[in-house]
């Protein structure tokens, strides 16, 4: 073989190797352990989320920038940190390197600790945690981890948006705070009091209650205390049965006050709200049911397939970010994907989003919506009630963004 021919062959071989590396991840199956409740009082929430993950995975498997296939592997954690750790052990035993969880910051905190230890002790078998709904601010502050990425806005960000809205509602004078007795509920109360004192010092906090998570079946005693306090407004971070049963008890007692919530759109709560709650129930989130466009089409298709609402939309952002990061890293290795996720910016269903490098907290726009009858502008019937959540305020990412004290070590 002549020297020029040799060079040509070597060049082609090098190009082939480069192309192979560029698409090394293409066709790979990426298993994601979904660790959340499928039994107990919070089962309806978990069942909706699992369906949503499987639906979005199927959508991305048809087309994503990394050319990978996502497979969601469910584990029932019964909203228990201990059960979450058992599920994580089972997942790692099956060589599953991606974990997603959201229902309960207690479980999220336990997973972060265990994943940190696993990744330190088992180089080459690192696990990456995508948190889609556990919103304790400590997870991206004092307890931040290189291996943890949060898709939802945290408690402090949501409260920043809620209190920015409340500030201009001059009829609000007396507030009662009720929450679940774990990290999230405690943080909601803390930030509500601090933000109200800063923005509306004239508002009185006339009562505060914490109750066990997913254990209370009758909220009548709590509602009686709210009524007796003279509150005109309730702030709550409750979710699942703890919100739907609270609202049910409030309706039965004729408690005619405003509720500012984080999760009034979650399974079961809209049905519990009913017509009597119209104009009084607000929720803050990274979207709402009447956004239309791409996410509107997904909602309609999901409802046609399952007769259920697709409301945990950051699941879409999660797989969008993961597939973009895998394409960027040219790998499905969690070590390389974590590095590619840091600082990643893209356009999602709710506008421009950015995975902030300093603490792995997603930066995104937030909306406040109110419960009302469907109309031409807001046509999506939530849980087939004839009612919907209509947007009343929209805040750009920078408005609700909060600073971080995170001091994580970046990279391995």
Model-derived regions: residue spans:
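Short, low-complexity disordered leader/linker segments with a strong preference
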Residues: 1-31, 93, 405, 409-412
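Beta-alpha junction/loop-to-helix N-cap segments that form part of ligand/metal-binding clefts
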Residues: 29, 44-51, 63-139, 151, ...
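Extracytoplasmic "Venus flytrap"
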Residues: 29-52, 75-82, 103-104, 178-187, ...
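Short, polar/charged alpha-helical segment
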Residues: 42-66, 191-198
């Amino acid at each position: 073989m002549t020297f020029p021919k040799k060079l040509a062959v070597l060049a082609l071989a090098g190009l082939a190797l480069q192309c192979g590396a560029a698409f090394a991840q293409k066709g790979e199956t990426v298993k994601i352990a979904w660790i959340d409740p499928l039994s107990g009082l919070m089962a309806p929430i978990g069942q909706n989320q699992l369906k949503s993950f499987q639906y979005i995975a199927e959508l991305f498997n048809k087309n994503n920038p990394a050319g990978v296939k996502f497979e969601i592997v469910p584990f029932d954690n019964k909203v228990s940190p201990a059960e979450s750790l058992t599920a994580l052990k089972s997942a790692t035993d099956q060589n599953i390197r991606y974990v997603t969880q959201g229902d309960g910051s207690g479980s999220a905190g336990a997973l972060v600790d265990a994943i940190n230890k696993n990744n330190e002790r088992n180089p080459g078998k690192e696990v990456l945690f995508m948190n889609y709904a556990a919103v304790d601010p400590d997870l991206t502050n004092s307890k931040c981890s290189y291996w943890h990425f949060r898709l939802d806005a945290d408690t402090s960000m949501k409260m920043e948006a809620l209190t920015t809205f409340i500030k201009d509602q001059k009829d609000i004078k007396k507030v009662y705070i009720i929450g679940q007795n774990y990290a999230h509920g405690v943080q909601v109360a803390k930030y509500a009091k601090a933000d109200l004192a800063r923005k509306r010092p004239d508002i009185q906090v006339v009562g505060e209650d914490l109750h066990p998570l997913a254990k209370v079946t009758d909220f009548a005693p709590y509602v009686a205390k709210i009524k007796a306090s003279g509150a005109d407004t309730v702030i709550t971070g409750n979710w699942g049965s703890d919100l739907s049963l609270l609202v049910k008890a409030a309706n039965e007692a004729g408690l005619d006050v405003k509720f500012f919530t984080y999760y009034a759109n979650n399974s079961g709560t809209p049905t519990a709200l009913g017509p009597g709650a119209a104009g009084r129930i607000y929720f803050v989130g990274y979207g709402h049911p009447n956004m239309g466009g791409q996410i509107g089409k997904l909602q309609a298709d999901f409802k046609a397939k399952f007769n259920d609402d697709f409301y945990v939309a950051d699941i879409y952002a999660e797989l969008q970010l993961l597939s973009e990061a895998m394409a960027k890293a040219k790998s499905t290795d969690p070590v390389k994907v974590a590095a590619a996720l840091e600082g990643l910016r893209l356009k999602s269903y709710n506008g421009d989003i950015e995975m902030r490098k300093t603490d792995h907290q997603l930066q995104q726009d937030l909306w406040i919506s109110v419960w009302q009858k469907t109309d031409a502008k807001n046509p999506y019937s939530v849980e087939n009630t004839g009612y919907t959540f209509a947007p009343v305020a929209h805040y750009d990412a920078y408005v609700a963004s909060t600073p971080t004290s995170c001091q994580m070590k970046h990279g391995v």
